[in-house]
Amino acid sequence: MQQLIEEITKEQLRTDLPAFRPGDTLRVHVKVVEGTRERIQIFEGVVIKRRGGGISETFTVRKISYGVGVERTFPVHTPKIANIEVVRHGKVRRAKLYYLRELRGKAARIKEIRR
């Protein structure tokens, strides 16, 4: 039974996404349905966590919008994500960057590394 589940989920996994880690700044292109129309909405921010594995893997992106912190969690393998762009790679020493929630302004910056 477990093999059957693994085979089915393996077909659903996306392979067109770039490699990214917590601390990286992403530009996520999300498909949004409004009535009968479908459009692309861009959500750009810092990856503060990545959890799970396989089909249930998710990541959370945080950005500041008009002075208010906004976090959005996306499943990695969802068809609602049209594209993911890695804007910059950040140098961090933690897997979960929850401490960024308390930091404001320049203190919340993440050092960039060249890859």
Swiss-Prot record:
What are the top taxonomic ranks of the organism?
Bacteria, Bacillati, Bacillota, Bacilli, Bacillales
Q: What is this protein called?
A: Large ribosomal subunit protein bL19
Species name for this entry?
A: Bacillus pumilus (strain SAFR-032)
Outline what the protein does.
This protein is located at the 30S-50S ribosomal subunit interface and may play a role in the structure and function of the aminoacyl-tRNA binding site.
PROSITE patterns per the UniProt record, alphabetical: RIBOSOMAL_L19
Entry's Gene Ontology cellular component terms = cytosolic large ribosomal subunit
Which segments of the protein form a coiled coil according to its record?
none
- Show which residues constitute the signal peptide: none
Q: Which SUPFAM superfamilies match?
A: Translation proteins SH3-like domain
Show the InterPro entries listed in the entry: Ribosomal_bL19 (IPR001857), Ribosomal_bL19_CS (IPR018257), Ribosomal_bL19_sf (IPR038657), Translation_prot_SH3-like_sf (IPR008991)
Q: Which Pfam families match?
A: Ribosomal_L19
Q: Which UniProt keywords apply?
A: Ribonucleoprotein, Ribosomal protein
Which family is it part of?
Belongs to the bacterial ribosomal protein bL19 family.
One GO biological-process annotation of the entry reads: translation
Highest taxon of source: Bacteria
Disulphides: none
